[in-house]
Design a protein with these regions (language model features):
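PLP-dependent aminotransferase class I/II
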Residues: 1-145
Length: 145
């Protein structure tokens, strides 16, 4: 496979490059709004590494009963992503190595979901996503109780 960039792709990306930092800053602001809305609740956002500055290409959360939550949110017009459904130790390149039990990785792979994230996501949109997400997760908790 040849994955080199052609001249047109290079020109487009070169034109976008000056905006990269402002887009990353906007994504960090959106992530901060998510963190504010979801703090202390049943939805856990993946933590930033201390001393780092996250680019927030994705905003990954851990939720119980992920597949039902995704279906319910989709019915409400909120699309989510599933970017890491298989833990690393279960992926093809690692199958030849010693098999180990990694229950935390297995659990995380079953709970993680990518929430809507783009630089210009409005405060009202973040609020709606968080409210619907919390309602959905809390409804599942009350069904179990």
């Amino acid at each position: 496979m040849n994955s080199r960039m052609d001249a047109l792709q290079a020109a487009v990306l070169l034109a976008k490059l000056p905006r990269l930092e402002s887009w990353a800053a906007a994504r960090r602001a959106v992530a901060a709004r998510y963190r504010s809305h979801l703090a202390g609740g049943p939805v856990r956002l993946v933590a930033d590494a201390p001393g780092s500055e996250h680019g927030y290409h994705l905003l990954v959360a851990r939720v119980p009963d992920r597949d039902r939550v995704r279906r319910t949110l989709a019915q409400d017009g909120i699309e989510t992503g599933l970017h890491y459904p298989v833990p690393c130790h279960r992926q093809v390149p690692y199958r030849g190595y010693a098999s180990v039990d990694l229950p935390v990785a297995e659990q995380a792979a079953g709970e993680i979901v990518s929430l809507p994230m783009f630089p210009h996501l409005a405060t009202e949109q973040v609020t709606r996503v968080c409210e619907q997400l919390l309602e959905c997760v809390e409804a599942a908790d009350s069904d179990v109780a």
